[in-house]
Amino acid sequence: MSAQEFYQGGNQRGYQQQQFPPPPGGPPQDQNGGKQEYVPPQGQPPNYNMKPSQPYASTNPETGGQPVYQDTAPFSQANEKTGERMNPRKRVNDIIPLILFIAAVVGFAVVSGIAIHGFVQVNGLGGGMGDSSIGRTGSSITLDYHTVYLLLVVVALGLVIASLYLAALRAFTKIILEVTLALTVILNIGICIYYFIIQYWSGAIIFLIIALVSVFFYWGMRKRIPLAKLLLQTTIDVTKHHPSVYVVVFIGLIIQAAVSVWYTFTCIAIYVKWTPGSAACSDGGCSSSKVAGLVFYATFSYLWLSQVIGNVILCTLAGGVFGGWYYYGPRTPGGGVPKRASLLAFVRASTLSLGSIAFGSLLVTILELLRLILQLFRQYEAGQGDMIGSILICIAQCCIGCIQWMVEYFNKYAYIEIALYGKSYIPAAKDTWRLLKDRGIDALVNDSLVGTALMWGAYINGFLCAVLGYFYLRFTHPAYNSDGQYSAPVILFSFLIGLNESFTVGSAIDAGVSTIFVGLGEDPMVLAERSPGLFEMIRQVYPRVVQGVPH
């Protein structure tokens, strides 16, 4: 089920491929293969009613001479995309992965319930929990009002700093992109020099390679800043008009945190419940192998569930506000982004497309599990003094880590295809492969520039929150920190709060930039018809946009 069908009940908006007539007095159309060369309009250029600093764009530009773009073979198969490809059947995709995912989550919940129930019954081995008839032998830690105030102030400061950084990024996009790119290169060189000074040779060699690569690519990436700047400005403007995207990502963050806490307690409870000799092991069915197997299963289910949650959020953003803006334009009394776009996209992502999301997430989960298993083997070999075996396993870990990164990057665009066009995972992966073959370098550089700018904003936010935590402890002198023993944990926790808040806000921006990039590759003429002024600005900094992705 496509975004258009889902939002409009199957009514098409008329985004069929058009042959733009040449402007009056312009050269005749080239009939060779139906192609025409770009010819600027004659006379006074049309007024698109759009300022360059506001790429959010109006959906109703004044009529006038239309720019003529080169019609390649044809615009990313526009007829196909506005036909059957944009209207897949309304059905649940990838049913088998969906069933496996549901079974894994239900099994995890059952194991967790049994384990935590046994854990609570024996007071958590002195952890202060359980039936009062048995006795609460554990000690508890109570947060006083100083800690509560600190957490509230740090959270508020983190949100304010994240908002201010986005405002600065919107106002000074090009400057911040250039500065953060240069800072990344300088940081890599600095870490490399530091490791050489302290004679940490393995780390020094790794960062020497990273520094050389970053210096080599620096100049090439600078040339692509104009496109990243325009897409970033457009995305920030979209989110300014639709702040619900931030609500979506923060809800996702809260759910992820809750699932992580659930997994942590489950693993602890599994050890308590089934470890031989434990007070909770009363039925004689305990063994170390059972503990290992259940922890492995819990870890697998947790990683898969965590991946699915994050990818459902991505599909909600891509198929909701950002996809709705690209295909329908800004919200107006007569149309634009559909109402409750995020809610509708979430419903589709968590029902019809959940199997496709689970399919892609399973691939990443398997790779992450392999990496964790290799980590355990490497620690074992190092403990046995087998350095050669440890080095070989470390190399294997690096290889699997690289493969995992590539699969995750590939999957991000596949999920956007799923969110926009309602595909199952395999067709989405095929179209993503075509997209990345044709625009892979452009997408990678664009994501790197945007990601670097957002990353430095997160570090700045985390640092300022940590400074606030330090000064708060210094001037309030809470009783629990009379000897300064909790200063480091509180400062670190403050840093992590600010860091995560910025990364959460940044994930919405990253999703928007990638969604618009996919739209420009798959259906460039949609934006050309809806907002020719914005499309012309993009064409000036990225001429390939008029070609579309061949299929």
UniProtKB/Swiss-Prot annotation:
Q: Which Pfam families match?
A: Choline_transpo
Q: Name one GO biological process term.
A: transmembrane transport
Q: Where in the cell is it found?
A: Cell membrane
Give the main localization category.
membrane
Which residues are listed as membrane-spanning? 95-115, 148-168, 178-198, 201-221, 245-265, 308-328, 357-377, 387-407, 453-473, 489-509
Compositional bias (Low complexity): 8-19
GO CC, sorted alphabetically, is: membrane; plasma membrane
Question: Known InterPro entries for this protein?
Answer: Choline_transptr-like
Q: A GO molecular-function term, please?
A: transmembrane transporter activity
According to its UniProt entry, the function of this protein is described as:
Probably involved in transport through the plasma membrane.
Q: Family membership, please give it.
A: Belongs to the CTL (choline transporter-like) family.
Q: By what name is this protein known?
A: Protein PNS1
Gene source species: Cryptococcus neoformans var. neoformans serotype D (strain JEC21 / ATCC MYA-565)
Q: Which gene encodes it?
A: PNS1
